[in-house]
Amino acid sequence: MVDYHAANQAYQYGPSSGGNGTGGGGGMGDYMAQEDDWDRDLLLDPAWEKQQRKTFTAWCNSHLRKAGTQIENIDEDFRDGLKLMLLLEVISGERLPKPERGKMRVHKINNVNKALDFIASKGVKLVSIGAEEIVDGNAKMTLGMIWTIILRFAIQDISVEETSAKEGLLLWCQRKTAPYKNVNVQNFHISWKDGLAFNALIHRHRPELIEYDKLRKDDPVTNLNNAFEVAEKYLDIPKMLDAEDIVNTARPDEKAIMTYVSSFYHAFSGAQKAETAANRICKVLAVNQENEHLMEDYERLASDLLEWIRRTIPWLEDRVPQKTIQEMQQKLEDFRDYRRVHKPPKVQEKCQLEINFNTLQTKLRLSNRPAFMPSEGRMVSDINNGWQHLEQAEKGYEEWLLNEIRRLERLDHLAEKFRQKASIHEAWTDGKEAMLKHRDYETATLSDIKALIRKHEAFESDLAAHQDRVEQIAAIAQELNELDYYDSHNVNTRCQKICDQWDNLGSLTHSRREALEKTEKQLETIDQLHLEYAKRAAPFNNWMESAMEDLQDMFIVHTIEEIEGLISAHDQFKSTLPDADREREAILAIHKEAQRIAESNHIKLSGSNPYTSVTPQIINSKWEKVQQLVPKRDHALLEEQSKQQSNEHLRRQFASQANMVGPWIQTKMEEIGRISIEMNGTLEDQLSHLKQYERSIVDYKPNLDLLEQQHQLIQEALIFDNKHTNYTMEHLRVGWEQLLTTIARTINEVENQILTRDAKGISQEQMQEFRASFNHFDKDHGGALGPEEFKACLISLGYDVENDRQGDAEFNRIMSVVDPNHSGLVTFQAFIDFMSRETTDTDTADQVIASFKVLAGDKNFITAEELRRELPPDQAEYCIARMAPYQGPDAAPGALDYKSFSTALYGESDL
């Protein structure tokens, strides 16, 4: 330090080395020249000079007292340069050259020049201030020099929002006094005359020292003295101004006011740093709390969706068949209700869950936080796998329902057909066993025997005709067994009874023939006409019975072609009716001829044809029945034809709409894929275009709703196929859901890109360059790059990731950042996040640790009281609940470890 006491030795006079100081940059010199508005050719205003002397003297003494000295007369005590050099050493904290020992003028000039050279070395241009004027006690030059020192060492470093020192100090005063009434700081002279601004500055930082509400604007002297006394007593700021001088001066000296106000700024700068540190911590904690809330929402939504999938899949995998078609149709209705009501909200939840997950990951990357890893079993991939399992079970369940309904329809048809044929057969066999067991031939005449033989032959013919029916009954019963008919036991019992009875009839028929043939040799007369009648009547009667069966037979058709085939067969049957009618007339003519011969020959007949039980009345009755059934069959076929025509109309209507909607969905999917790759214009333009595109898609929803209505009509009509279109309702539903999901995901990607761009300060040109590079290597236009494609993209952008050991290590590090889940793919969003991190600064754990250290007063730990004093209540309690106790050797009671807490926020340790 300068030995300002060593001034006793004799000086030798020599040439002056005074003059302006040198050095300093142009920028700093220009700044000082702007601040220095001294008119060096004129004398100072006496009032201003008085204020400056008092203020500058007090300011110098506030620093010189640290060295154990002071000045009394500012233009006299600096003349030898010793205290001037000492002042510069105190305020700069640097050593100046050793002063010259001697009291001669040359020694004083040299000492002052050393001080001026030191000032110039700090980038200050000393305009018209020379050592000779200071040594000669020039008051104006001395005050100007001190003002230059004050500007450089007390005011220059004050900067608020990149303003100059004077403007920064003024802006600081304006901000701190803004909430106070009657205070309007616009300058450094008249704005301070009433003293309220000084009191407001003190009250803003130390409210316990000033009772501001009791101050009056019309009592400036009291206000000024109150502020000066409080500042000197409690803030260690010496009294640099005189209240009466300020009040009685029309325009107080600006430099004196600035000097005094700068002392307040430096006194309160510590509080400003604490406020900045607290704001930084609050910002970091707010981001962390928001991310935790998003993580909790994701876990809850994912858990609910997976639970719904877990409950739904067993229901869809239930394949227990029902006994009746009504029960299966109820199952089908329940399934349609699931498709219409229960599933669509879950599809929307799944899409929203993916969007929330991507947004959360983007926010974590932007805030330099580790990627979010959901709980085990709740990853997006787990949800997609569960959803895929659900879709597979759903598809299999619908196919099973339709197959079961077809099976039950087939079973109902076969069961009814079995009952009809069995009833007809049982009616035919009724009494046949008793007839075959009858021993009437033992007492019959020869003619009777011959009649019995003929009758038996007719019966055998009838029996042979019924063989087909029995085989059909057995075949139907077998098919019912194979299709697992629920009442197959009764069917089998009835079928077995019919077969056993049929075998017994065959055996009885054979035995009776042998008995009749044994006595046939005794019989010679036979009525040929009755025989001919019987032989022709029996087949004709069987034909009529078969015709009645066919006319009453149930039919199930599903297409126009099938019903037209039935109509054609029916028309062909009707074309045979004239021949059948002629056959009937011929048979009746035989009976009439027999009656005529008997009457003409006075032959007494027994009344019935001995060879057959088919009388003309039966033939006529059955013929009338056939004639009645034909128009009924016509009506039934025409009704079914109308139904199938209606079904065909439904098919064509659905196909027309589906063939329009299906290609539209495919076209939109392709256009979205192209838009997501090309991405022309700004991101905002792209987002607006995509949202307009999304609205056009949503506006198309009525076409899909119309298709759903048409599909409902088709299902109600039990139409199972449609040859007019390859699109199914399920296919179109899936396509629509994928379209909505794709456009929502694309919009979300652009929004995340905007978020990334704004957060990281990426220009539109950079974003377009990144997109162009990404698209160039995205050969398959899949929206993601494989490792080799990503490496090529990085190399094209100038990253040193060549195929050597060092390049491989760097590339593996980059891959762990852009692909934390190790999926083997790098999305464009991850690529943008990486590029933005490489080109912009982000907050770090070290910054947060430094901020906590400011709040803790440079201690290695912080207390709960300090956190509650500096942070908002909720964030203070958040820190206290999560900070571990400090274990260091300098730990105090209640000490908390803010370092481990800060690193945990950035994933560098565990909370």
UniProtKB/Swiss-Prot annotation:
Q: Where is this region: Interaction with VCL?
A: 12-26, 40-61, 108-126
Task: Please name the InterPro entries in this protein's record.
Answer: Actinin_actin-bd_CS, CH_dom, CH_dom_sf, EF-hand-dom_pair, EF-hand_Ca_insen, EF_Hand_1_Ca_BS, EF_hand_dom, Spectrin/alpha-actinin
Pfam families assigned to the protein according to its UniProt record, in alphabetical order: CH, EFhand_Ca_insen, Spectrin
Q: What is its main location?
A: nucleus
Binding site residues for Ca(2+): D778, D780, E789
Which species does the entry assign this protein to?
Rattus norvegicus
What does the annotation say about its assembly with partners? Answer: Homodimer; antiparallel. Interacts with MAGI1. Interacts with MICALL2 (preferentially in opened conformation); stimulated by RAB13 activation. Identified in a IGF2BP1-dependent mRNP granule complex containing untranslated mRNAs. Component of the CART complex, at least composed of ACTN4, HGS/HRS, MYO5B and TRIM3. Binds TRIM3 at the N-terminus. Interacts with PDLIM2. Identified in a complex with CASK, IQGAP1, MAGI2, NPHS1, SPTAN1 and SPTBN1. Interacts with PPARG and RARA. Binds to VCL; this interaction triggers VCL conformational changes. Interacts with SEPTIN14. Interacts with IGSF8.
Polyphosphoinositide (PIP2)-binding as annotated region, ranges: 177-192
Q: Where in the cell is it found?
A: Nucleus; Cytoplasm; Cell junction; Cytoplasm, Cytoskeleton, Stress fiber
Q: What protein name does the entry list?
A: Alpha-actinin-4
Residue ranges of the region described as Mediates interaction with MICALL2: 736-911
